[in-house]
């Protein structure tokens, strides 16, 4: 069962109940806390566009705890993040894997973070094909083009040479928050205020 907490907010017009995600959205916080599919992407994209319409100058905060998911759905989020005017700060909590790590790296330069115990995992895109040999060949060419595109963007976002990205994403590659910073996937590890 998936319960969504409700918060009560008192205003001069009385009390108002919000689901927690709507309340966070008021503070320009978007939660990506699941696998990425078309429905999740549509929700994230809608929230990004809404927050831009509200104020195109203020940063948006995208918290990521995701195992990844659909490449096309993730690219819809990525393209929107790059298209809108506000900077999108990305913060990894828990795990940002696969497309989740790609979106983490897609945040505004200097504004990509991870909590100290967060993990980041990068790898090449997954896919499968069935059907006639020609259909399998078409699918294979497509996934190779997709891998090339993702690797090129990751190289741009991290500052790593494309050859290193290709090697490092050949298999699941798990990084600690500090390793993700050294790699260029994030800019800072967030530590508690002292």
Curated annotation (Swiss-Prot):
Cellular component aspect of the GO annotation: cytoplasm; endopeptidase Clp complex
Annotated CDD domains: S14_ClpP_2 (cd07017)
Record-level GO BP terms: protein quality control for misfolded or incompletely synthesized proteins
Entry EC number(s): 3.4.21.92
Reaction catalysed by this enzyme: Hydrolysis of proteins to small peptides in the presence of ATP and magnesium. alpha-casein is the usual test substrate. In the absence of ATP, only oligopeptides shorter than five residues are hydrolyzed (such as succinyl-Leu-Tyr-|-NHMec, and Leu-Tyr-Leu-|-Tyr-Trp, in which cleavage of the -Tyr-|-Leu- and -Tyr-|-Trp bonds also occurs)
A Pfam family it matches: CLP_protease
GO MF entry, a single one: serine-type endopeptidase activity
Key words, A-Z: Cytoplasm, Hydrolase, Protease, Serine protease
Subcellular location: Cytoplasm
Protein family membership: Belongs to the peptidase S14 family.
Subunit structure: Fourteen ClpP subunits assemble into 2 heptameric rings which stack back to back to give a disk-like structure with a central cavity, resembling the structure of eukaryotic proteasomes.
Protein's UniProt name: ATP-dependent Clp protease proteolytic subunit
Organism: Macrococcus caseolyticus (strain JCSC5402) (Macrococcoides caseolyticum)
Lineage: Bacteria, Bacillati, Bacillota, Bacilli, Bacillales
Gene (UniProt): clpP
């Amino acid at each position: 069962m998936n319960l969504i907490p409700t918060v009560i907010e008192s205003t001069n017009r009385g009390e108002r109940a919000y689901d927690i995600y709507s309340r966070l959205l008021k503070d320009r916080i978007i939660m990506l806390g699941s696998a990425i599919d078309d429905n999740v992407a549509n929700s994230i994209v809608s929230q990004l566009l809404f927050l831009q319409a509200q104020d195109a100058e203020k940063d948006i905060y995208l918290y990521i705890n995701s195992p990844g998911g659909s490449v096309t759905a993730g690219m819809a989020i990525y393209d929107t993040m790059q298209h809108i005017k506000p900077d999108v700060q990305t913060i990894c909590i828990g795990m940002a894997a696969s497309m989740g790590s790609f979106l983490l790296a897609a945040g505004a330069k200097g504004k990509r973070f991870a909590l100290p115990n967060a993990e980041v995992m990068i790898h090449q895109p997954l896919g499968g094909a069935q059907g006639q040999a020609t259909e399998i060949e078409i699918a294979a060419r497509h996934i190779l083009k997709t891998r090339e595109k993702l690797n090129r963007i990751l190289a741009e976002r991290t500052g790593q040479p494309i050859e290193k990205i290709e090697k490092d994403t050949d298999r699941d590659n798990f990084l600690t928050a500090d390793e993700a910073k050294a790699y260029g996937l994030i800019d800072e590890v967030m530590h508690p205020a002292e």
